[in-house]
């Protein structure tokens, strides 16, 4: 089975030498694998803001490389232990995508490690943590995929939304290895089309029977018995079992509940234990022009306004189960995961 580009982050976000980060621009996939060179943390932050990297875990590690570049710059200036400057860089990187919790958690961990190991080079300390984080992220994705695969029955068609990360790809991989015939229906996920460009493409590269639909077709497909299960990811899971994910997740959960279709969240490492309630999760609001244009071309009149919340909150009562490395959990019991 072909392993798609997005199954392993190190294939599309990686260092070139010691002072440059290469990011494969996901906005250009699958038509081209355009390389973007970042030489400082500000360029990394802009790349994240401009959606060149997507997915909470991948964004966090990419931002970690941004902090590494900030440390390298300080070391070239013979001021490699200036924690105030590193903190400013971390704050800039954290501000790029405020809804997901992985980014802020990793930034805090990296700064703490640098403070703790006062005798070492900050860039080397950061890079060592990032290498371990990459390995751990792969292990978590694989374990989550294995847990999720047990929920599938041969003959199922799974509805996906946006790009749910490597765990989703591993779920399909393990199902295929176990002889299960599983199909996918992917929402295109406006306005950046992650479902079309990333999820549908990746699954088709793996040999999965994959069908693309527009976002407004999901309820119809459910009503016709075309979908047996729904799987999405989570940018943040609150301790009350509420989930923040790509906008549109809530409406899929409502439709799935009405149709009696199981709705699962790939929760990877589990909840953010500092976020008690879903209502506490900040919702990123992006530039409305991203809705008014498609690949730079206006799609409506000049007087039309737009609104673009990038995420929504799905309450626990609409979620069948949250899949983590440790198993499948009822949303209201996710605090014990």
Where are these regions (language model features)?
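N-terminal active-site beta-alpha-beta segment that forms phosphate/nucleotide-binding
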Residues: 45-213
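Positively charged, low-complexity intrinsically disordered leader regions
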Residues: 2-42, 49
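Conserved phosphate- and dinucleotide-binding cores of soluble alpha/beta proteins
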Residues: 187-337
């Amino acid at each position: 089975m072909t392993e798609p580009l997005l199954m392993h982050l190190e294939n599309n976000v990686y260092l070139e030498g010691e002072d440059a980060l290469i990011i494969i621009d996901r906005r250009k996939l699958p038509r081209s694998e355009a390389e973007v060179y970042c030489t400082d943390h500000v360029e990394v932050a802009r790349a994240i803001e401009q959606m060149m990297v997507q997915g909470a875990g991948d964004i966090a590690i990419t931002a970690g490389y941004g902090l590494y570049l900030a440390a390298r710059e300080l070391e070239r200036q013979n001021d490699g232990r200036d924690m105030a400057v590193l903190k400013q860089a971390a704050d800039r990187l954290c501000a790029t995508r405020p809804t997901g919790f992985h980014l802020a958690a990793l930034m805090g961990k990296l700064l703490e490690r640098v403070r703790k190991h006062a005798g070492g080079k900050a860039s080397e300390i950061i890079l060592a943590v990032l290498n371990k984080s990459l390995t751990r992220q792969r292990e978590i994705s694989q374990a989550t995929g294995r847990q999720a695969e047990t929920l599938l029955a041969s003959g199922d068609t799974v509805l996906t939304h946006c790009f749910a990360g490597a765990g989703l790809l591993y779920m399909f991989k393990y199902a295929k290895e176990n002889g299960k015939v599983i199909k996918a229906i992917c929402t295109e996920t406006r306005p950046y089309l992650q479902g079309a460009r990333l999820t549908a493409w990746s699954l088709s590269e793996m040999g999965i029977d994959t069908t693309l639909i527009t976002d407004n077709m999901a309820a119809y497909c459910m009503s016709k018995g075309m979908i047996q299960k729904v799987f999405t990811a989570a940018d943040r899971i609150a301790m009350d079992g509420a989930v923040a994910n790509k906008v549109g997740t809530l409406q899929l959960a409502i439709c799935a509940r009405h149709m009696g279709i199981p709705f699962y969240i790939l929760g990877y490492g589990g909840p953010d234990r500092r976020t008690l309630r879903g209502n506490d999760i900040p919702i990123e609001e992006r530039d409305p022009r991203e809705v008014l244009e498609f690949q730079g071309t206006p799609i409506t009149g000049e007087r039309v306004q737009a609104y673009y919340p990038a995420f929504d909150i799905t309450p626990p009562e609409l979620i069948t189960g949250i899949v983590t490395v440790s198993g499948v959990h009822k949303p209201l019991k996710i605090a014990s995961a």
